[in-house]
Amino acid sequence: MARMVMCKKLGRELPGLAYKPFPNELGQRIYDSISQDAWKLWLEHFKMILNEYRLAPADPRTTEILYQQAEQFFFGENAQLPPDYRPPPSKG
């Protein structure tokens, strides 16, 4: 049975992550209070951040941006979108 957490992002009790996503205090906070569903939303948001800012995953600065964006996404008021971001056209 999945470990349940009161998800800070989605505001309800949902299955938690199976492991800490980052080896630091932020990773522990996410593990303790973010659900699998919210993590899936984050992965989509982070892909958008990587593409819009043209970040290189191997660049150490990308890791710092990842942590800042994750902190804002999960625990801040609202996640910031890149200034020139345009959502993709809807399918349908």
UniProtKB/Swiss-Prot annotation:
Gene3D superfamilies: Fe(II) trafficking protein YggX (1.10.3880.10). GO terms for biological process: cellular response to oxidative stress. NCBIfam families: PRK05408.1. Keywords: Iron. It comes from Anaeromyxobacter sp. (strain K). It comes from the Bacteria. Belongs to the Fe(2+)-trafficking protein family. Pfam families: Iron_traffic. The keyword Transcription regulation does not apply. One of its GO terms (cellular component) is cytosol. This is Probable Fe(2+)-trafficking protein. HAMAP family: Fe_traffic_YggX. The keyword Iron applies. InterPro entries: Fe_traffick_prot_YggX, Fe_traffick_prot_YggX_sf. GO terms for molecular function: iron ion binding. Could be a mediator in iron transactions between iron acquisition and iron-requiring processes, such as synthesis and/or repair of Fe-S clusters in biosynthetic enzymes.
